[in-house]
Amino acid sequence: MAGDESGTTLGQPHLYKQDLSTLDVSKLTPLSQEIISRQATINIGTIGHVAHGKSTVVKAISGVHTVRFKNELERNITIKLGYANAKVYKLDDPSCPRPECYRSCGSSTPDEFPTDIPGTKGNFKLVRHVSFVDCPGHDILMATMLNGAAVMDAALLLIAGNESCPQPQTSEHLAAIEIMKLKHILILQNKIDLVKESQAKEQYEQILAFVQGTVAEGAPIIPISAQLKYNIEVVCEYIVNKIPVPVRDFTSEPRLIVIRSFDVNKPGCEVDDLKGGVAGGSILKGVLKVGQELEVRPGIVSKDHEGKLMCKPIFSKIVSLFAEHNDLQYAAPGGLIGVGTKIDPTLCRADRMVGQVLGAVGALPEIFTELEISYFLLRRLLGVRTEGDKKAAKVQKLSKNEVLMVNIGSLSTGGRVSAVKADLAKIVLTNPVCTEVGEKIALSRRVEKHWRLIGWGQIRRGVTITPTVDDD
């Protein structure tokens, strides 16, 4: 891997050089040039009804197609979380009118490049590096959004101009934003090229009425066409000026939630050339460094002869870090970070490590097998199309011994309700999970053959298991 011997990044010479020997974590900010040159530091979720153009908008801004999997391309829907990074630039020529002075490019573009707008001079300079978390627009999304597998700082809410507003999932997503307490929202009225001006104005009124009284009230509404890249620079301007730079914790022990993992070795590879497994995820806090020792919890889960769950955390070392195609020497919170490790690649292949937590040795939270939560149920089922003027089905109370799907971090696992009181419930988990008291979890119930979000909860306490560690 480039540059892991010398402690400086050798890949991408046109980007800012990172040097581990001079790194002072306490001086870093989400706008430090050495970080935003190579990785994103602000996460923006794209949400909205299916086929309203979320992935297309991300592609228009970043140049990255987030739909990477074959079955997604065929069905034209996003199934897994897609991440795409984009650098936002501003021209340093004051005579250039806004919004033309803003521009977005892919994450490996140089930090400065000369203007190509006739009649202007100067350079485009990097001002933000954002990561778009392109969520699948269905129920999975709800769970993914709620359980904080991705730290989201802001959201782009997409509404297609050629359909009436609101569509069922749009209201569901607004509910999720409310629950997550996301305050910074931009509403994009997409597909504006398909409608007449009068229709666009009429829908603008509908959108205003729809967001009234919600967390999105007062959010700017920008008419765009993602396919024609119309008004995309306006979106860039709003990203720079309307979304405040988040406060990040760079000094704590690092922690990363794994949302993807893979084996990068090709079949038939020589034994000496084998590379360790790669885990991808979003860093919640702290800074990961190349060469650092790391621990993954819960690790390898098995049952002993009595059928009790056992966990064996995995210990390893970071050999490389990267964000999209950029090599890193250290990685901060924001965007999807790939962590190259020395872990046995078979443990990582095909997303096997999803739901695990990776961090500094000895600094990770407890492993729980049972949780006691205080929970809140939604009044009605969301996102279910209702006939005519019928109200959506009410959410039934939790009952003892029913099985729910629980989403914690990036882990989805079954959970049996073992006891339930007014607003407290005890849940026995099918798989152990590494988490801590105070974390939010999402609860889903099987309704008509689909998992539907019914509420969310917060961990109050639980039953933990002591991980087993080999003495060798």
UniProtKB/Swiss-Prot annotation:
Residues 134-137 are annotated as: G3. It is found in: Cytoplasm, Cytosol. Disruption phenotype: Morpholino knockdown of eif2s3 produces morphants characterized by hypomotility and morphological deficits at 2 dpf. They are shorter with a curved tail. They also display a significant reduction of head size and small eyes. InterPro entries: EFTu-like_2, eIF2G, eIF2g_C, eIF2g_dom_2, eIF2g_GTP-bd, P-loop_NTPase, T_Tr_GTP-bd_dom, Transl_B-barrel_sf. PROSITE patterns: G_TR_2 (PS51722). The keyword Nucleotide-binding applies. Residues 48-55 are annotated as: G1. GTP binds at A51, H52, G53, K54, S55, T56, N190, K191, I192, D193, S225, A226, Q227. GO terms for molecular function: GTP binding; GTPase activity; methionyl-initiator methionine tRNA binding; translation initiation factor activity. SUPFAM superfamilies: EF-Tu/eEF-1alpha/eIF2-gamma C-terminal domain, P-loop containing nucleoside triphosphate hydrolases, Translation proteins. Residues 457-469 are annotated as: Interacts with cdc123. GO terms for cellular component: cytosol; eukaryotic translation initiation factor 2 complex. It catalyses: GTP + H2O = GDP + phosphate + H(+). Residues 190-193 are annotated as: G4. Residues 39-247 form the tr-type G domain. It is an enzyme of class 3 (hydrolase). The keyword Protein biosynthesis applies. It comes from the Eukaryota. Keywords: Cytoplasm, GTP-binding, Hydrolase, Initiation factor, Nucleotide-binding, Protein biosynthesis. Member of the eIF2 complex that functions in the early steps of protein synthesis by forming a ternary complex with GTP and initiator tRNA. This complex binds to a 40S ribosomal subunit, followed by mRNA binding to form the 43S pre-initiation complex (43S PIC). Junction of the 60S ribosomal subunit to form the 80S initiation complex is preceded by hydrolysis of the GTP bound to eIF2 and release of an eIF2-GDP binary complex. In order for eIF2 to recycle and catalyze another round of initiation, the GDP bound to eIF2 must exchange with GTP by way of a reaction catalyzed by eIF-2B. Belongs to the TRAFAC class translation factor GTPase superfamily. Classic translation factor GTPase family. EIF2G subfamily. Eukaryotic translation initiation factor 2 eIF2 is a heterotrimeric complex composed of an alpha (EIF2S1), a beta (EIF2S2) and a gamma (EIF2S3) chain. eIF2 is member of the 43S pre-initiation complex (43S PIC). This is Eukaryotic translation initiation factor 2 subunit 3. It comes from Danio rerio (Zebrafish). The lineage of its organism: Eukaryota, Metazoa, Chordata, Craniata, Vertebrata.
